[in-house]
């Protein structure tokens, strides 16, 4: 397996891991813990009873960005697998790179907005759903860089293929 294929495989594996972490983070209700309960983007649970969170701008922005980040990550995974299974043109690889970096940016916005809302409350502690989001962030960016390097290798190979090599 060449360097390009290895980078694409690594990018797909990291993207798969980040997609799983992002979906788990988005759908579970353990973003914060407080005395007697926990809450997420969609519901808050107190003493075993869960109810929907009333509409708050910061939580709505975080939820929307998380859903978009998860969607873009999954779409990038599908394109990345298609690129690896078939020798696809460079345009698909560039779309994957853009989707991965955009997904990472949306994830960063969601987590930063949620952090700014809850970081100042001394009785609130961040929990595992929240940390899954932060854990997915570097994996998305590293996956994007893997596809970027693989695309650069492909473009440089195409660029020098017409030159005669004298060694």
Swiss-Prot record:
Bilayer-spanning residue ranges: 13-32, 61-81, 96-116, 130-150
Q: Which GO terms describe its cellular component?
A: membrane
Domain of life (superkingdom):
Eukaryota
- Where does the protein end up? Membrane
What InterPro entries does the record point to?
PMP-22/EMP/MP20-like, PMP22/EMP/MP20/Claudin
- Work out whether the entry's keyword set contains Flavoprotein: no
Where does the signal peptide begin and end?
none
Does the record bear Protein biosynthesis in its keywords? no
Keyword list (alphabetical) reads: Membrane, Transmembrane, Transmembrane helix
Which family is this protein grouped under?
Belongs to the PMP-22/EMP/MP20 family.
Protein name in UniProt: Claudin domain-containing protein 2
């Amino acid at each position: 397996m060449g360097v390009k294929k290895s980078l694409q495989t690594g990018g797909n594996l990291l993207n798969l891991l980040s997609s799983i972490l992002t979906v788990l983070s988005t759908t579970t209700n353990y973003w914060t813990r407080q005395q007697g309960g926990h809450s997420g983007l969609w519901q808050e649970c107190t003493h075993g009873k869960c109810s929907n969170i009333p509409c708050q701008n910061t939580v709505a922005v975080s939820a929307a960005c998380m859903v978009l980040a998860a969607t873009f990550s999954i779409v990038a995974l599908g394109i990345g697998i298609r690129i690896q299974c078939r020798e696809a043109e460079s345009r698909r690889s560039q779309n994957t790179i853009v989707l991965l970096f955009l997904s990472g940016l949306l994830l960063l916005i969601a987590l930063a907005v949620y952090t700014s809302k809850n970081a100042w409350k001394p009785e609130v502690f961040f929990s595992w759903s929240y940390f899954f989001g932060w854990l997915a962030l570097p994996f998305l960016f590293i996956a994007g860089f893997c596809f970027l390097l693989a695309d650069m290798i492909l473009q440089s190979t195409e660029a020098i293929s017409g030159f005669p090599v004298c060694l």
